C-alpha cells in the first residue's frame, strides 16, 4: 500500500486529494482558495476532522509548502517520502501529449510551449508541477492532460475549415477539454449499466462553470464541443462559447474595442453572466427564473438548447445513443437543467422520470427506455491517481 496525491492547480486555487493505492481509499482531501491574497482559505478534511484556516498565502509555492506542513502536523502522513507519486491535471497538452506521462524537464517545456492555448490554466499547472518536483523529489510526478482523451477524434472532426497549412505548421485544430472527466464517467456508466464500454455509444455532458459535450464510441472520444481552446462550444459561466468569428473584427474596427478587451469579454464577461446580467452561477439563475426574470429564463433556454444541438448532432453521427450522461456541478445537481434538456430529446427516445430526476437517482430515465439517462458524479482526482499508479508500478518494478 502506498500514497498518491492528485493535484488540480487553478489560477488562484489548489485542489488536492491523497489516495491509498491500489485500494483507492481517500486519505485526505482539500482545497486552498484565494491564493495571492491576505485572506486565503485552507480547507482540509480527513477521517472525521475538518480544518479551515484563513491566512496569507502569497503564491502557489507557499500553498504547497503549507499543505505539506499541515499533512505532517495533523499526522495524515509522518514522512513526505510516504507519497510515492503526484499527479497533476494539465489543461492543455496540444498534439505533443497523447496520454499522461512522467514529468521531465522536456515535458515541462512542452507544457510551457502551449501555454498560449490555455492562458488561464496552464501557468498555474506548471507552477504546481515545479513546486511539487522541488519539494517531493523522490515522488514520481505525472502530468495528466485534459486534452489527451480527445486525441482519438478523427481528422474530419478535429480540423477547422481553414487553409490546411495552418494545421500542418501551427497545429490549429480542435483539441477538446474535460477529457479526464468524460473518460471517467463513460467507464462508470458502463459499470452502472452492466454493459461493456466497447459496445456503448455514449454522450457525456460535463456541465459546470466550464461545460462541454462529448461523443464517446467504444470508449473513445470521437467528437467534443470545446475546440482549440476551452472557450469554444457551449455558452458557459462567463465564456461566450462558439460565436461568428467576424464579430471579433467588428467589435475592434467598428466599436473601438481593443483585442485584449474582446478576449477578456469573451472569456470573463459573456456566457451565462453576459446574457442574464445576474450571475455566472446557475443556482442564482434558477432562482431568478423562478421569480419570472425574463433574461434568466432566456439564459436557461439558450444553454439547454445548445446542449441539445450537440446531443442531436452526436447521436446522428454515431447512428444512435445508448446512454446520455450528466456530470459536474450543474449536471449532477440541477434537476431543472436535466429536465429542460431531456424534454427536447423525445425524438431520440429520451425520457426523464420526474421522481428519479428530483431525487438525483443514478439512472433517471424510465426503466424500459433504450436510451439510459444517467447522473454520474465525476471523479477526476481518482482518474489522475489511477494514471499515477501505473507509472509508480513501472518505476518500482
From Swiss-Prot:
ATP binds at residues 15, 206-210, 281-283, 329-333. Mg(2+) binds at residues 8, 380. Its EC number is 2.7.2.1. Mg(2+). Can also accept Mn(2+). It holds the Pfam family Acetate_kinase. Homodimer. Catalyzes the formation of acetyl phosphate from acetate and ATP. Can also catalyze the reverse reaction. This is Acetate kinase 2. It comes from Listeria innocua serovar 6a (strain ATCC BAA-680 / CLIP 11262).
Amino acid at each position: 500500500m502506498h500514497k498518491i496525491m492528485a493535484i488540480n492547480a487553478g489560477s488562484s486555487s489548489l485542489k488536492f486529494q491523497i489516495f491509498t493505492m491500489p485500494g483507492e481509499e481517500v486519505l485526505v482531501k482539500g482545497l486552498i482558495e484565494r491564493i495571492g491574497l491576505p485572506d486565503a482559505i485552507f480547507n482540509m478534511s480527513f477521517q472525521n476532522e475538518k480544518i479551515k484556516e484563513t491566512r496569507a498565502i502569497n503564491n502557489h509555492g507557499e500553498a504547497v509548502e503549507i499543505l505539506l506542513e499541515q499533512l505532517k502536523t495533523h499526522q495524515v502522513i509522518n514522512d513526505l517520502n510516504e507519497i510515492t507519486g503526484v499527479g497533476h491535471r494539465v489543461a492543455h497538452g496540444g498534439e505533443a501529449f497523447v496520454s499522461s506521462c512522467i514529468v521531465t524537464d522536456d515535458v515541462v517545456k512542452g507544457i510551457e510551449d502551449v501555454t498560449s492555448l490555455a492562458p488561464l490554466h496552464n501557468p498555474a499547472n506548471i507552477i504546481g508541477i515545479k513546486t511539487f518536483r522541488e519539494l517531493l523529489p523522490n515522488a514520481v510526478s505525472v502530468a495528466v492532460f485534459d486534452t489527451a482523451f480527445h486525441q482519438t477524434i478523427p481528422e474530419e472532426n478535429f480540423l477547422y475549415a481553414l487553409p490546411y497549412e495552418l494545421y500542418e505548421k501551427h497545429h490549429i485544430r480542435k483539441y477538446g477539454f474535460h477529457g479526464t472527466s468524460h473518460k471517467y464517467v463513460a467507464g462508470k456508466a458502463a459499470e452502472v449499466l452492466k454493459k461493456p464500454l466497447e459496445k456503448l455509444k455514449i454522450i457525456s455532458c460535463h456541465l459546470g462553470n466550464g461545460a462541454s459535450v462529448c461523443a464517446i464510441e467504444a470508449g473513445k472520444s470521437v467528437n467534443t464541443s470545446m475546440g482549440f481552446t476551452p472557450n469554444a462550444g457551449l455558452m458557459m459561466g462567463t465564456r461566450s462559447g462558439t460565436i461568428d468569428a467576424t464579430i471579433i473584427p467588428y467589435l475592434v474596427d467598428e466599436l473601438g474595442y481593443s483585442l485584449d478587451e474582446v478576449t477578456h469579454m469573451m472569456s470573463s464577461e459573456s456566457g451565462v453572466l453576459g446574457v442574464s446580467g445576474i450571475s455566472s452561477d446557475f443556482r442564482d439563475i434558477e432562482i431568478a427564473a423562478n421569480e419570472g426574470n425574463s433574461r434568466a429564463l432566456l439564459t436557461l433556454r439558450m444553454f439547454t438548447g445548445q446542449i441539445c444541438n450537440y446531443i442531436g448532432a452526436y447521436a446522428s453521427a454515431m447512428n444512435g445513443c445508448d446512454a446520455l450522461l450528466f456530470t459536474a456541478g450543474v449536471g449532477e445537481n440541477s434537476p431543472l437543467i436535466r429536465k429542460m434538456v431531456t424534454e427536447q430529446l423525445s425524438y431520440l427516445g429520451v425520457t426523464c422520470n420526474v421522481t428519479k430526476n428530483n431525487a438525483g437517482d443514478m439512472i433517471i430515465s424510465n426503466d424500459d427506455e433504450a436510451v439510459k439517462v444517467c447522473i454520474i458524479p465525476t471523479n477526476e482526482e481518482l482518474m489522475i491517481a489511477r494514471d499515477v499508479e501505473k507509472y509508480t508500478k513501472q518505476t518500482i518494478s
